[in-house]
Amino acid sequence: GGEMTTVAVRLARAYTKKEKIMICGYHGWHDWYLATNISNHNNLDNHLLPGLNPLGVPKALRDTIIPFNFNNFEDLINIVKERANECAAIIMEPARNSLADKSFLNEIRKIASKNNCVLIFDEITSAWRNDTSGIHKELGVNPDLATFGKTMANGIPIAALIGKKKIMEQVKNTFISSTNWTERLGPACAVAFIKKHKRLNLGKILQNKGKKIRDIWTQSAEDSNLKIKIDGILPLSSFKIETQNKDDWPIIITYFIQEMLKKKILASDRCYSNYCQSDGLLD
């Protein structure tokens, strides 16, 4: 996934002849992405993890990556609208802990088009959950490029990039390569998965399982007199136990994972719905 977002950014820079990139979400571990923390170690706090150290990333990349916050209309006006003309691309996840606001995406689409800025949707996590494709189809906002990852092959390593021909053809003008591009297991698994996804209407099944997981969490919290907050699209649900001190959460979730392991269950604060989760297993 990280390699494919890097390819998308490379093509956007080749196409626009600009260098700066706006980001909103988690797009991998590569230098181009982590470079945003050179100027401010807190830049990725709301996108990945707090306090990530960009040690080893060339300082020459300082100020080449501009972050903005998900569904934040103030950032939309003060950052995206003001600086899009400097940027080769806006790359973002159309679903993070929740679906992007459609008006937020529509405005970003307009800004990108107006400023010769490639709009990239990172669908590595969000695709194939609600539907047999990217979640941008559900939202009705089309990017210029979109990236997909191993979900499309049921977990077998694979990544894909789709997009407008005029941008994709920049691959002829730059250098992109991979040792594993001639490997065929991933594509074969992807074809089989997509066919089965369509046949089973798997998106609907995953949504129903996600709702059941949420119902179980809600009831368990009520039974234990706990206040929880549930986020995410249904197939990618997560929870957080709310306390007076927000710094308690890392301790709470560590304890939760520890106690679940004692029950021989590998669990955290999020659950990715899958076809094999029976009602009995979820209960």
PLM region spans:
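Active-site PLP attachment segment
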Residues: L139-V171, T182-C189
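PLP-dependent aspartate aminotransferase-fold enzymes
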Residues: G1-E86
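Conserved PLP phosphate-binding loop immediately N-terminal to the Schiff-base lysine helix
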Residues: I91-F104, C117-L139, L145
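Conserved PLP-binding catalytic core of the aspartate aminotransferase-like
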Residues: G210-R214, A221-F256
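Active-site core of PLP-dependent enzymes with the aminotransferase class I/II
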Residues: N72-N78, P94-N115
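Structural signature of PLP-dependent enzymes
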Residues: I194-T218, K246
